[in-house]
């Protein structure tokens, strides 16, 4: 019989199976048809009516029919067939677009860089994880707004009535709006650490032997990518530290607002970078999330005259990032594929400066960029 298999990214494919096939055999079938690199058998979790299927059971035992469907997702570590539970993914994910959670995880220092490249300040997700994990973080479906509501409904349907809307929303919040991780949490429980703020020590933000490079002229900061200098919080010291009103007149914050209005997806890497450079300000934002979202969503003055900051990145964003000559060539090759330079740099940094992963990310999300 033909069996439909859905993914958490909204796509689906069909495989041919027998009702007597075991779940392990179905996983092997998916691996063979979709590729070992995409769906390795040992990392697959198959879900039917809100239940993770055990490897030794059969399709007929789990009442899987041709009219129904399975949901496939990947666990970071190999899933135990007899356990029947999803393993909680522990890889770090950047701050959510909705900014509704308050977890910031430490990031490893970047490698030595050299020549500057003017660009929009999209930080790298500098994680001590494998490249495949890095791409998973960069390309994972981080959703917001109407897309978030749609994802909530999809996950509720996936659970077959096992989860209510409040539970799914809480799981998504704890998972930084990453649906794959949220489903993991729904099956295995939401770790308490996922809902606790973890300030990033300043000692962890220093680069390892990186040569200092001055930012492009006109930049309001002396450090590349430093959107909110420590003085930003210090300047508010005489006022009420429980409010973010002082950000209204902050040039860096106005730049962030302009960019977020034109491309909401960049907010979460911005917040991650902020956590590395200025944990005190990030903590303040976490304590006043509603006010922060209100400030970000307010219409900015002169928007008609300023235009989209992604249209003229070199003029609008006088910051600099540090790249090696080899990385500069990689960026140019990605640009040659027809993508905007600012988007190329955003993807390149988000994929931990891996050209192949950045290319895949740009291709997979090209429709979103056009919107």
From Swiss-Prot:
Residues 146-189, 325-365 form the UBA domain. Residues 79-117 have a biased composition (Low complexity). One of its GO terms (cellular component) is nucleus. It is found in: Nucleus; Cytoplasm. Signal peptide: none annotated. Disruption phenotype: Slow growth with abnormal phyllotaxy, shorter primary root with fewer lateral roots, shorter inflorescences, smaller siliques and reduced seed set, with unfertilized ovules interspersed among seeds of normal appearance. Mutant displays resistance to mitomycin C (MMC). Increased UV sensitivity in both roots and hypocotyls, specifically in dark conditions. Residues 128-142 have a biased composition (Polar residues). Keywords: Cytoplasm, DNA damage, DNA repair, Nucleus, Repeat. One of its GO terms (biological process) is proteasome-mediated ubiquitin-dependent protein catabolic process. InterPro entries: Rad23 (IPR004806), STI1_HS-bd (IPR006636), UBA (IPR015940), UBA-like_sf (IPR009060), Ubiquitin-like_dom (IPR000626), Ubiquitin-like_domsf (IPR029071), XPC-bd (IPR015360), XPC-bd_sf (IPR036353). SUPFAM superfamilies: UBA-like, Ubiquitin-like, XPC-binding domain. Pfam families: UBA, ubiquitin, XPC-binding. Widely expressed in the whole plant. The keyword Ribonucleoprotein does not apply. CDD domains: UBA1_Rad23_plant (cd14379), UBA2_RAD23_plant (cd14382), Ubl_Rad23 (cd01805). PANTHER family: UV EXCISION REPAIR PROTEIN RAD23. Interacts with 'Lys-48'-linked polyubiquitin chains. Interacts with RPN10 via its ubiquitin-like domain. Interacts with UBQ1, UBQ2, UBQ5, UBQ7, UBQ10, UBQ11 and IAA16. Binds to RAD4. This is Ubiquitin receptor RAD23b.
